[in-house]
């Protein structure tokens, strides 16, 4: 295969409360290697103002921008999907719906569901292993008691101590300015059936462990790996929960290796 034929379309999916902006260090590095890169804003995230957070109560609604992108791809095009943190659930949904359009999916310290439990299984496990005190000034709220979706937003203290503790202070300050409330859609995830073996389970998965992640600790990451083993496990030992900021060069090197090896 020629070098030109190896160039891939890489799709980057952000985690909770963030947006496409969080990939600003990664996107140009991948493009410099010749790849086409699309960073997606999920619904009511980043600079997406076309949807209101009060209108989002399901995973489909939250993931709609990613699904629209996948639908628009030609039938003969396959992408490299990369998801971070909560974005792993949107990745899984895309894999389940469009398995033939994805060459490989990369879970970057991301929630990686299995094909036996409901998608909320991985989130519920994290919440059980994390006390409310550890979330510090993160706000979990609802617009009104009978609203079916819970909103949450990371607080600045939580971001500084647990999300960005090894990242440049400039990136932490940028994030403080740009994070938005995120729909938790927990009820929908809990009621949803498991992802299928024929769809989600058929796509090659790679997991990138972040060794200094205080939000999704390494033990939690490896429990997801043991529960539903991916094709390969890679590691960035000194990355916090935000490797695109704390270790962008190492993350890009792994993504380039994955694209070359599996796409």
Curated annotation (Swiss-Prot):
The active site is at residues 85, 213, 241. Keywords: Hydrolase. This is Methylesterase 3. Its EC number is 3.1.1.-. It comes from the Eukaryota. It comes from Arabidopsis thaliana. One of its GO terms (molecular function) is hydrolase activity, acting on ester bonds. GO terms for cellular component: vacuole. Pathway: Plant hormone biosynthesis; Lipid metabolism; oxylipin biosynthesis. One of its GO terms (biological process) is oxylipin biosynthetic process. PANTHER family: METHYLESTERASE 3-RELATED (PTHR10992:SF1007), METHYLESTERASE FAMILY MEMBER (PTHR10992). It catalyses: methyl (indol-3-yl)acetate + H2O = (indol-3-yl)acetate + methanol + H(+); methyl (-)-jasmonate + H2O = jasmonate + methanol + H(+). The keyword Hydrolase applies. Pfam families: Abhydrolase_6. Methylesterase shown to have carboxylesterase activity, methyl indole-3-acetic acid (MeIAA) esterase activity and methyl jasmonate (MeJA) esterase activity in vitro. It is an enzyme of class 3 (hydrolase). Belongs to the AB hydrolase superfamily. Methylesterase family. Disulfide bonds: none annotated.
């Amino acid at each position: 295969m020629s070098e030109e034929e190896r160039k891939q379309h890489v799709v980057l999916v952000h985690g909770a409360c963030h947006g496409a902006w969080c990939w600003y260090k990664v996107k140009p590095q991948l493009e410099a290697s010749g790849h086409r890169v699309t960073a997606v804003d999920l619904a009511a995230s980043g600079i997406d103002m076309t949807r209101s957070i009060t209108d989002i109560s399901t995973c489909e609604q939250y993931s709609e921008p990613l699904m629209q992108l996948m639908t628009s791809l030609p039938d003969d095009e396959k992408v490299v999907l990369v998801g971070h943190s909560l974005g792993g659930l949107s990745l899984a949904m895309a894999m389940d719906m469009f398995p033939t359009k994805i060459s490989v999916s990369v879970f970057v310290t991301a929630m990686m569901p299995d094909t036996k439990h409901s998608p909320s299984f991985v989130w519920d496990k994290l919440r059980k292993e994390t006390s409310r005190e550890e979330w510090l000034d993160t706000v979990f709220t609802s617009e009104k008691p009978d609203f079916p979706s819970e909103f949450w937003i990371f607080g600045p203290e939580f971001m500084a101590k647990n999300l960005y503790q090894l990242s440049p202070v400039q990136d932490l300050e940028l994030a403080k300015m740009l994070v938005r409330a995120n729909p938790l859609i927990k009820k929908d995830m809990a009621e949803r059936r498991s992802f299928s073996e024929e769809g989600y389970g058929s796509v090659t998965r790679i997991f990138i462990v972040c060794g200094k992640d205080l939000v999704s600790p390494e033990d939690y990451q490896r429990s997801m790996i043991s529960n539903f083993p991916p094709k390969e496990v890679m590691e960035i030992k000194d990355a916090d929960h935000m490797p695109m900021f704390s270790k962008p060069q190492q993350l890009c090197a792994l993504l380039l290796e994955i694209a070359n090896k599996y796409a």
